[in-house]
Amino acid sequence: DAERHEYRVDGVLLPSVTQVLKPLQDFSMIAPAVLEHARQRGIAVHIAVQLDICNDLVEESVAPELAGYLQAWRAFRHDSGIHEADFGDPEKPLYHPLYGFAGTPDVPFFFKKRWAVLDVKTADALSPVWGLQTAAYLELINANTPKGHHKVVDRYSLRLRENGTYRLEQHTDKNDWQVFLSCLTIHQWKGKNL
């Protein structure tokens, strides 16, 4: 259920990557209206990026306040030399059959001669949680990749800015997946016991 950000497999509700990582992020100091505005902006930018990848974006449909983010996305595509054929399926909901969690990785893509997962962000500041998030997305994609096909190897966050610039951050900490699994175990324990 995209509207509620819920994932079900055979009627069973699975925790999302976002839900699993929620205890690691404290947004209590940010006004709810500001958070909601940022959330809506992020959704709109993700839709624009997805449509741009698929060459389905109608320029006139982009709200003026989102133009800089789209400009940043296109600058990244230009600077990195990534073409349409270099992208996998964007925003494809997946679940992990072994670990029982789900999520929607933003963009699998071929970059620097290797498959990677790219998570698009519109936040003002970098977050260490993004490494954990991309580790979970990498594992989701690889768990759903048929044998004999290329696996995702690298993880990136792409922070798009309103002024049309971007920052690409590679996540290389090998512990990120283990930390995510620890969070998942705690989330599952709480669901059974509290």
Indicate where each model-derived feature is located.
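Metal-dependent nuclease catalytic cores that hydrolyze phosphodiester bonds in DNA/RNA
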Residues: D1-A102
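Nucleic-acid nuclease catalytic cores
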Residues: L94-T185, W189-L194
